[in-house]
Amino acid sequence: MQIILLDNVSNLGKLGEQVNVKAGYARNYLVPQGKAVPATRKNVEYFEKCRVELVAKLANIKSAAEARANKINELGSITILSKAGEEGKLFGSIGTRDIANAISMAGINTKKSEVRLPNGVLRTTGNHIVSIRIHSDISVAINVLVIAEK
């Protein structure tokens, strides 16, 4: 199925590109999410007229994401307290929700879906580098310090 992308979609294409995808992916995900429209003659003509507005909208979204990335960089690191055993192993684990909440408590709104844990959840005390993917093009690393609660 031929579609026109209304947004940058990772592993698929950028705004305005006509791409061929499976019908189910287009019908069930891209079109309902507002990321694409079917590539009919009418939609192609309409898109060419609205292209400037969509590019400006994406530029605004990206600039807002860059501003959030700068705030997170200024933050540098966050500290999370958790119950731990003698050898530094946590009772439980620290996941994406805990990290997102800690960043939000520091004054920067962050969703748990933006937090990337390359090695899985945090199960030990100490310093851990965590990636925050704010936008498809913008990713920021932050230091998470896990301290044992007394």
From Swiss-Prot:
Q: Which cellular components does GO assign to this protein?
A: ribonucleoprotein complex; ribosome
**Has keyword Manganese?**
no
Q: Which keywords does this Swiss-Prot/TrEMBL entry list?
A: Ribonucleoprotein, Ribosomal protein, RNA-binding, rRNA-binding
Listed GO biological process terms: translation
Q: Which Pfam families match?
A: Ribosomal_L9_C, Ribosomal_L9_N
GO MF terms held by the record: rRNA binding; structural constituent of ribosome
Name the coiled-coil region(s): none
Q: Which family does it belong to?
A: Belongs to the bacterial ribosomal protein bL9 family.
NCBIfam families found in the cross-reference section: L9
PANTHER family noted in UniProt: 50S RIBOSOMAL PROTEIN L9
According to its UniProt entry, the function of this protein is described as: Binds to the 23S rRNA.
Q: What is this protein called?
A: Large ribosomal subunit protein bL9
Organism of origin is Baumannia cicadellinicola subsp. Homalodisca coagulata
